Amino acid sequence: MTSLQAVTVPGIPTLTSGDDVAAVIAPHLAALTWPDASVGLRGDDIVVIAGKIVAKAQGRWHRAGEDPDGFRTRAGIPDQLGLKAPVDVKREAGQIRRGLAARFGGRPGVIISGSGRSCEPGRGVLDIALAAAGIDAKRQGGEAVIDAVAAAAGVMIAPDCPVVVVRGVADVLTWED
């Protein structure tokens, strides 16, 4: 790895229960324009997806104040609703990766990220990987790379832009989920 690039994916619509995440984001990935004027997703890119859109596709809505798990996400969520954390994220990451590989070829990596407050007061919010697919976590430093990529993308992820593509870390990709 000599350089790292990250680009937000504009135009992702709000997902609803039952949506296929890979199918919804694929047209936007295909139209993605990079700083060097290249277009689209390459088979050696990593797609970082906010866990919130996976939870929406899973229909994880609840009424505010009624979540028995005590977890809820608030950014970009109507006041009367809450959104539980996505479930079975490893399986979801694998399904999304396979869907993107079928559409774009190669072996794209997928990270489903989530954000939370730092333990240290005043340090703000940080993004971590909830799950990953197509990235070799077993190689030396693999898990650290996954969280570092999630954190880098987290700087760019926003309620209106929940997907970021990272280029430049192909050496950690694998054909396995």
What is each model feature region?
Residues 19-40, 85-104, 108:
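Phosphate-interacting basic helix/loop segments used at nucleotide- and nucleic-acid interfaces
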Residues 39-47:
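A short aromatic-anchored loop/beta-hairpin motif
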Residues 2-16, 46-56, 60-85, 103-177:
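A structural signal for small-residue-enriched, beta-sheet-centric alpha/beta enzyme cores
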